[in-house]
Regions:
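C-terminal motif of bacterial Sec signal peptides marking the signal peptidase cleavage site
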Residues: 16-17
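Hydrophobic beta-strand core positions in alpha/beta domains
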Residues: 32-34, 132
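A short, Lys/Arg-enriched amphipathic alpha-helix followed by its capping loop at the start of a domain
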Residues: 54-62, 119-122, 126
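Active-site-proximal cap/lid insertion segments
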Residues: 24-28, 35-51, 58, 67, ...
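Catalytic-site neighborhoods of secreted/periplasmic enzymes
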Residues: 82-187
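Sec-dependent signal peptide recognition
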Residues: 2-8
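A short, hydrophobic C-terminal helix/tail in secreted or cell-surface proteins
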Residues: 291-296
Length: 296
């Protein structure tokens, strides 16, 4: 992860279009969306014109647009640790992408310590139900850095950030339980991970709409590998970009040659990237369509 961009820190007030201080509810639901390897120049609200992001652009127009909301580091784990703890990169306990890669059953990164004060713990202490969905990367399943031990009532997604770069993985995690994805073996593309994560996120919001909640949505999109379902989103971009096909490098495949270890070949990298950004935009609008009341 070279760059991170926060798409929106959305609250009930923002989603409902409230602009007057007196009209805002006392306790706001908070939805924090984090994208991976998305530059500010990839969004329409910052002047980009080739990739469609109408829903994110609308959130920016009706809310607040930041120009100095920086990633904490140049790679995933320490950057996420800085965000989760509020600490400068020089003080946060995670200094690099150390840990497993998913090979040979080893999964997950070096854990943040048990006594770390995280956003999840802060919101839980304030009476919020908390959930995180997508990419974690701050401690392997069952370790002290496991999200369910770091203030989150519910987690669904990739525990290991190395595996999070596969959009058709063999499994995801629900809390500390591994959920196998039938039909996926890294070479076959049956269940697109982020569509599943999106549905679980919406389910969390619906189940908790009568309570105040904090949802941290850490998407991998549009980080490589550049891979999306064959649907109307990618079809809309075909033929619009000059392409330079990406070929998987020698050694990027498992010894038996059955699946790519790193990134798969992609004949349409620019088309695929654009479709990934627009897919993220589609996900974002889902939250604005939900009614999210809080108790008085």
């Amino acid at each position: 992860m070279k760059n991170q961009l926060i798409l929106t820190a959305a609250s009930v007030g923002a989603l409902s279009g409230c602009t007057q201080q007196e009209n805002r509810p006392k306790d706001l639901n908070v939805i924090y969306i984090l994208a991976d390897d998305l530059g500010y120049g990839d969004l329409g609200c910052y002047g980009q014109t080739k990739i469609h992001t109408p829903n994110i652009d609308r959130l920016a127009a009706e809310g607040m647009l930041f120009t100095q909301h920086y990633a904490g580091c140049t790679v995933s784990a320490p950057s996420r640790s800085a965000l989760m703890t509020g600490q400068h990169t020089g003080h946060t306990p995670i200094r690099g992408n150390k840990g497993g890669t998913g090979d040979d059953g080893v999964e997950g990164q070096h854990p943040i310590p048990a006594d770390t004060y995280t956003l999840g713990k802060m919101f839980r202490q304030a009476g919020y139900v908390t959930g995180t969905f997508g990419k974690w990367g701050l401690g392997s399943p069952g370790s002290e850095g496991d999200p369910t031990y770091q203030g989150f009532d519910e987690f669904f997604g990739y525990n290991c950030q190395a595996l999070a770069h596969k959009y058709y993985p063999t499994h995801l995690w629900h809390n500390r339980e591994k959920m196998l994805l039938d039909g996926n073996d890294l070479a076959h593309t049956t269940q697109y991970s982020h569509d599943i994560i999106q549905e679980r996120t919406l389910d969390f919001i619906r189940r908790n709409k009568e309570r105040k909640f904090f949802a941290f949505l850490a998407y991998t999109l549009p980080h490589a590998e550049l891979l999306v379902p064959e649907d109307e989103i990618i079809e809309a971009y075909r033929g619009r970009f000059e392409e330079k096909p990406y070929a998987a490098k020698s050694g990027d495949y498992s010894p038996e040659g059955k699946h790519p270890i790193h990134y798969c070949s992609q004949p349409e990298p620019r088309t695929s990237f654009a479709a990934m950004v627009t897919r993220l935009d589609r996900y974002a609008v889902s939250y604005t369509h939900l009614t999210l009341p809080t108790k008085a």
